[in-house]
């Protein structure tokens, strides 16, 4: 289902340019602050493809920057973007800020090795996928196959991004209940590579991180 976006939606933020000033996309940056669905990820996919195939070779960026603040959304749309990110010849740095949750976290973890940055006050939510379905018995039984495939995709993605074993992933990142993390807990679990403010080069020490209290 398509939704009406506010005037400050991600595509407006990234396309704005005053006069002759370049837009964020022109500078190799994209700010994603939205739910994850086909409408919201399509502009990011197009941006990555344009940077790889449309921009003249001599003008291509050495690195792309994708900043993410998302409460999550559709898994299929997330994996569509993830596959495009992984196929990019230009490394993609990811910066998580505000909140990266559910499928938004999956997208963040896909950033280039050593280039996944969390800001100190970012909230991280990792949990099992949820799925609502209806239909006749034989239709629901057929859907079980996709449940199994989705679970396999999730585990493979977490494993490749964190280098944790399946047992540890299920215990610390995909347990039965939601798992909220602060930036330093995420760092220890291999979700990110560094904790820093977007324009800061030195990592932020643990003492400066605001702790997140969860219910």
Predicted ranges, named:
Residues 1-215:
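Terminal-region recognition feature
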């Amino acid at each position: 289902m398509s939704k009406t976006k506010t005037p400050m939606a991600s595509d407006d933020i990234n396309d704005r340019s005053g006069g002759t000033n370049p837009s964020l996309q022109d500078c190799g940056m994209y700010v994603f602050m939205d739910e994850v669905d086909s409408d919201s990820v399509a502009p990011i996919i197009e941006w990555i493809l344009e940077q790889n195939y449309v921009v003249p070779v001599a003008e291509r960026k050495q690195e792309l920057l994708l900043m993410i603040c998302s409460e999550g959304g559709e898994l299929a749309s997330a994996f569509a973007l993830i596959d495009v990110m992984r196929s990019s010849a230009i490394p993609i740095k990811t910066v998580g800020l505000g909140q990266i949750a559910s499928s938004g976290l999956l997208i963040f973890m896909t950033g280039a090795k050593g280039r996944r940055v969390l800001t100190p006050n970012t909230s991280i939510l990792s949990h099992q996928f949820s799925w609502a379905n209806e239909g006749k018995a034989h239709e629901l039984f057929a859907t079980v196959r996709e449940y199994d495939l989705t679970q396999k995709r999730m585990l493979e993605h977490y494993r490749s991004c964190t280098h944790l074993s399946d047992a540890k992933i299920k215990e610390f990142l995909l347990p039965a209940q939601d798992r909220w993390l602060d930036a330093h807990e995420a760092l220890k679990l291999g979700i990110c590579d560094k904790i820093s403010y977007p324009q800061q080069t030195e990592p932020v020490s643990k003492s400066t991180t605001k702790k997140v209290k969860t219910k």
